């Protein structure tokens, strides 16, 4: 899904409008996710929901929407024919490298930031869910602002700001262990960390600017694969490090973010 989603965005949205338009799409996605999560939280006990019911209803609604779109919009014409095979081009090496580092950063957030909240502060499922809802609401508000900032200051400055911010956030995660900082600081870092995901749109629009139009679809597929290479080994490797020193995991994450900054 994400490969097709990113490919179509970069093909159809004009370069000058891309940062703002993609940011609105991100805000809309966060808003819909917020509503879905909130409905589950509010109706789970009231309606006696189960995982099976939630997945069946969600999957059924998605299938109905897909069928509607299939018949309502039978064909979209892309402005540029796309290469139908995978490609690797040397001139996209920086984009590939940044995608790999972005994947590593995502794994650290998904696996270890949440684990910290549970292990260190004993967060329950409902508390983690509430924290996630807060991050979604924040993205609804902040994502359009980030799109405007990227449009004004450019991708390079936006990405440098993201990587510098991530270094600070990961070091602060380590400080939770080294200095015994409390739950409010940790929760705030979790929200800020998640907000930084919105700055990933700068990497998308950077690629849109440097890519040959016919390379967008195949490179989106390659980049998505590169992004997930870290998911193969990083959680296991850092998981062993976590057993020795949880703070060291976040120090290593800060080092990775600093590599992207450089």
Q: How would you name each of these model-derived features?
A:
Residues 165-179:
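C-terminal ends and interior cores of transmembrane alpha-helices
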Residues 59-78, 262:
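C-terminal membrane-cytosol helix-exit motif in multi-pass small-molecule transporters
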Residues 22-40, 226-234:
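Glycine-rich segments within core transmembrane alpha-helices of 12-TM secondary carriers
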Residues 111-128:
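Short amphipathic helix-loop junctions that connect adjacent transmembrane helices
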Residues 1-28:
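Cytoplasmic helix-loop-helix junction between adjacent transmembrane helices
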Residues 44, 142-155, 242:
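Helix-to-loop junctions at the C-terminal end of transmembrane segments
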Residues 1, 183-198:
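Hydrophobic core of transmembrane alpha-helices in multi-pass small-molecule transporters
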Residues 152-164:
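Cytoplasmic membrane-interface "Motif A"-like loop-to-helix N-cap segments
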